[in-house]
Design a protein with these regions (language model features):
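Conserved adenylate-forming
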Residues: 14-27, 32-76, 98
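Structural core segment of the AMP-binding/adenylate-forming
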Residues: 1-10
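Gly/Ser/Thr-rich phosphate-binding loop
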Residues: 98, 121-126, 135-197
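Glycine- and other small-residue-rich loops at beta-strand/loop junctions that grip anionic moieties
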Residues: 21-24, 45, 78-79, 101-105, ...
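Conserved AMP-binding/adenylation subdomain of ANL enzymes
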Residues: 53-73, 83-123, 137
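Alpha-helix N-cap/helix-start capping motif
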Residues: 29, 106, 128-129, 156, ...
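Conserved S/T- and glycine-rich ATP-binding loop of Class I adenylate-forming
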Residues: 29, 35-38, 74, 80, ...
Length: 197
């Protein structure tokens, strides 16, 4: 092959002859998502295409007046194997054309904050522990948060003291959600414009 394009053309033509289309329905299994094991051993939750797409549609209705399609810059600091991050950061924000900034090691606070300073992010998702970690950084507290539209807390309860410090530092409320792996994951979430309670 002279280049990658030639290889891809050959591969696509070969696949057209050898592969047949697979018919899927909304009730077909999309993935097995493992739970966090907070109440015992980790279990595989069966999630269908309909489960995941329903959650994405619910998210779309929830945030539609707060976002601009294709213009959001989202901080993805939670692991994508966690259902909260997988659904919200990857599936939803990718679906609407957002730019996801993947933080591969959020425990490396110095580099995490350095990355946050580099991008004018509009959304961040985190757990209480991560919000607290960021608030310990004097460099983080000096970031310009003018573009930050909302912060979503999930995966564990966000403490009121954390939410108050976050609001004071960023000018942005933490919007708390609740869910389970088995529900792919969102069950309920507060309104973005509401004060934390």
């Amino acid at each position: 092959f002279n280049n990658f394009r030639e290889f891809m053309i050959l591969w696509i033509n070969k696949c057209k002859n050898e592969l047949s289309e697979i018919k899927l329905s909304g009730d077909d299994v999309a993935l097995l998502q493992y739970t966090g094991g907070t109440t015992g051993k980790s279990k595989a939750a069966i999630l269908t295409h309909k489960n995941l797409l329903s959650n994405i549609n619910q998210l779309s209705l929830w945030v539609k007046s707060h976002i601009k399609i294709g213009e959001e810059v989202v901080i993805t600091a939670l692991p994508l194997y966690h259902i909260f991050s997988l659904t919200v950061n990857l599936l939803y924000f990718y679906y609407i054309g957002s730019r996801n900034i993947l933080i591969t090691n959020p425990r490396d606070l110095k580099n995490f904050v350095k990355t946050l300073k580099k991008y004018e992010f509009t959304v961040i998702t985190a757990v209480n522990t991560l919000f607290n970690l960021l608030l310990t950084s004097s460099v983080f507290r000096k970031i310009n948060f003018n573009k930050l539209k909302f912060s979503i807390g999930g995966g564990m309860a966000v403490l009121k003291s954390t939410a108050n410090k976050w609001k004071k530092t960023t000018g942005c409320e933490i919007t708390q959600g609740y869910g389970l792996t088995e529900t792919s994951p969102i069950v309920s979430v507060n309104k973005i414009e509401d004060k934390f309670n």
